[in-house]
Amino acid sequence: CIVDAVAGGGYFHYAGDFNDQQINFYQYANAFVKNGGSFSWATDLGSGFVNSYSFYLLGSPFFWLSMVVPARLMPWAMVPLLCLKMAVAGGGGYLWARRWVRDETWSMLAGCLYAFSGFSIYNIFFNHFLDVVALFPYMLAALDDAVIDDKKGAFPFWVALNLVDNYFFFAGQAVFLIIYFFCMAAGRRYEL
C-alpha cells in the first residue's frame, strides 16, 4: 500500500470499484455524517442514508476512525486505512494462531498469511470486505477464550462488532463459527 502510494505521488492506483465507489462512499459519508444529514438525495434517486450505507461502512470501526480526517482528504487517507486494516487482520490472525502453535514464529507467519491471503489482496478493491477480514479472527479467538478458558466477556463484544460491521458477511461468519465449534468439540480441543 505505502510503496504504491509513494511511487504514485501519494495516490493509491487502482481501477474499478475502488475508485468509482469505495473512495467516493467514504468521502461522501464522511461529509454527510459531519453535516448531520439523514436522507441522501445524492444516493440513487434519493435514499435513507442508513439504508444505503450500512452494508458498506456505517458499522465499520475503520470508517468511524476516518471521521478525524476532513472529507476532502479522504482519497489520501484510504492508503493508511488499508494498511491499518491489514495490520489489524495480521494481529488477529496472530492472536488466534498463538493458542494453537508451540513456536510463536509460526503464529506470526499465520498472521501474515492471513492478512495477505489471496482473498484479501484480490478483494482490496472492495474496501468493506477487508473490514470483515480484519475483525473476524478476533471473534474466533474470543470463542476459543470463552470455551477453553471460560473467559466469556470478549465473545459477545466481537460478535456484536462483526454483526454491526457488515450484517451480510456476518451470516457466513456465524455459519463458520458453528462448524468450527462442532469440529473443535469433535476433535476434543473443546472440553464440553
Q: Could you describe each region identified by the protein language model?
A:
Residues 189-192:
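Membrane-interfacial entry segments at the cytosolic side of transmembrane helices
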Residues 1-90, 112-134:
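Membrane-interface coil-to-helix junctions
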Residues 83, 87-99, 105-187:
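Membrane-embedded helix bundles of polyisoprenyl
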